[in-house]
């Protein structure tokens, strides 16, 4: 078979599997996910052996530490995947849930019901744990999934997919509910993006180049997990005791992820009280800081920022520092350089906090807490398939609810339209 014929066949099989999944009971879906968790533990050595092939190739290619961190299937990452599966199992199944019902004057009862989207294509880079997280959510929501990971994680993704398919087979569920595109060339993605008769939604998750490529070339609706250029605005009415813990956690806990902090905005009225000590603490933790001209006199650890630095998703221990004159300046800066992912404010002023929540456009706005909380697990959604920075049809972490759509259910008793 040619490359195109192979990928078209994957789409056809996925569509057939999606039809099978529509009639699957919640207990059957949960049984599959439970078995996946058991197999992840039982086959940990195999998974890490395959993952090491990817890590070795990555080191040889000179991948950054942040990229290698995302790629690694450590014991803790595998434990986290198992935990995520248990959380998804515990979540209520949205499929079949009726959302309200009204009685029309003609006697018709009209309601809406949650139903699966159908077939979802997931295109992602580096992080092999996405394979499990995405498949778990799609299966629980009754969707078939086609996975196309990055070439840097090919061995890891194929190993994880084999676990998923084995669990499906053991539960006597169509194994084509989960399929992986093993071809690593970009032509495979281009072909897949043209399968509008088989695929209902495409979710790209990775670097800016991948997102733009998918958006430009897809004939299928795209739900974008765009870059995370996240900021924290330190307001003039901030509680100074909260500033350092929030900023340090948001930047350093895991700098290579999309909800890590990439910039801080400090009101000029408190910059002298905040920045010298904060910059010293960040520098001691290995954080590189690039700041505006107003910030430079307050710390020797800050170097002058270039225009390219503003709005950059560093994904490493690097942070932009900007001094602003007002709330309006902070809001304008975020509008220009933010990516509509996560924006935080540190303030004790209720009015300012309320304005920030209402006026700043992001999938999550955070008051007096770390940007790292914009995460499906932290927000009670269980594992997430990504964080959407587009507003249709989901905005923010995409859990089970966001992987369904709604259809009208009309109950009558012989009514005809006049």
Curated annotation (Swiss-Prot):
Q: Which GO terms describe its biological process?
A: L-proline biosynthetic process
Q: In the Enzyme Commission scheme, what number(s) does this protein have?
A: 1.2.1.41
Which pathway does the protein contribute to?
Answer: Amino-acid biosynthesis; L-proline biosynthesis; L-glutamate 5-semialdehyde from L-glutamate: step 2/2
According to its UniProt record, what is one Pfam family this protein matches?
Answer: Aldedh
Which principal EC class is assigned to this enzyme?
oxidoreductase
Cellular component GO terms, alphabetically? cytoplasm
Cytoplasm: is it a keyword of this entry? Answer: yes
Query: InterPro entries, per this entry?
Result: Ald_DH/histidinol_DH, Ald_DH_C, Ald_DH_N, Aldehyde_DH_dom, G-glutamylP_reductase_CS, Glu-5-SA_DH, GPR_dom
The cellular location(s) given in this protein's UniProt record come to:
Cytoplasm
Name the source's superkingdom: Bacteria
PANTHER family from the UniProt entry: DELTA-1-PYRROLINE-5-CARBOXYLATE SYNTHASE, GLUTAMATE SEMIALDEHYDE DEHYDROGENASE
- Which NCBIfam families does the UniProt entry name for this protein? PRK00197.1 (NF001221), proA (TIGR00407)
Protein family (similarity comment): Belongs to the gamma-glutamyl phosphate reductase family.
- Full protein name: Gamma-glutamyl phosphate reductase
From what organism does this protein derive? Desulfotalea psychrophila (strain LSv54 / DSM 12343)
């Amino acid at each position: 078979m040619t490359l195109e014929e192979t990928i078209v066949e994957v789409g056809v099989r996925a569509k057939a599997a999606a039809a099978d999944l529509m009639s699957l009971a919640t207990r059957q879906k949960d049984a599959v996910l439970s078995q996946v968790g058991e197999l992840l533990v039982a086959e940990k050595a195999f998974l890490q052996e395959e993952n090491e092939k990817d890590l070795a190739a990555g080191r040889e290619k000179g991948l950054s530490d942040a990229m290698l961190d995302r790629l690694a299937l450590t014991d803790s990452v595998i434990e986290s995947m198992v935990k995520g599966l248990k959380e998804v199992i515990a979540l209520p199944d949205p499929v079949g849930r009726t959302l309200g019902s009204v009685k029309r004057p003609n006697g018709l009862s009209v309601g809406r019901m949650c139903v699966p989207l159908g077939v979802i294509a997931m295109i992602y880079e580096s992080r092999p744990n996405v394979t499990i997280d995405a498949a778990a959510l799609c299966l629980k929501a009754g969707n078939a999934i086609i996975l196309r990971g990055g070439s840097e994680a090919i061995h890891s993704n194929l190993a994880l997919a084999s676990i998923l398919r084995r669990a499906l087979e053991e539960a006597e569920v169509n194994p084509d509910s989960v399929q992986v595109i093993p071809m690593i060339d970009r032509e495979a993605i281009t072909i897949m993006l043209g399968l509008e008769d088989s695929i209902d939604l495409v979710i790209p998750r990775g670097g800016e180049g991948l997102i733009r490529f998918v958006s430009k070339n897809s004939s299928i609706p795209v739900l974008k997990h765009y870059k995370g250029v996240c900021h924290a605005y330190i307001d003039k009415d901030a509680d100074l005791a909260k500033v350092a813990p929030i900023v340090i956690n948001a930047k350093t806990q895991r700098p290579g992820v999309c909800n890590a902090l990439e910039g801080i905005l400090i009101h000029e009225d408190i910059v002298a009280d905040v920045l010298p000590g904060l910059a010293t603490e960040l520098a001691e933790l290995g954080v590189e800081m690039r700041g505006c001209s107003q910030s430079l006199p307050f710390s020797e650890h800050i170097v002058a920022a270039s225009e390219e630095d503003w709005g950059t998703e560093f994904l490493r221990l690097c942070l932009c520092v900007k001094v602003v004159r007002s709330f309006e300046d902070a809001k304008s800066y975020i509008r220009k350089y933010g990516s509509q992912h996560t924006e935080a404010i540190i303030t004790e002023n209720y009015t300012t906090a309320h304005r920030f929540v209402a006026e700043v456009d992001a999938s999550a706005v955070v008051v007096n807490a770390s940007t790292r909380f914009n995460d499906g697990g932290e927000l009670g959604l269980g594992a997430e398939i990504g964080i959407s920075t587009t507003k249709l049809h989901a905005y923010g972490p995409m859990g089970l609810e966001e992987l369904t759509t709604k259809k009208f259910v009309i109950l009558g008793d012989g009514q005809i339209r006049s």
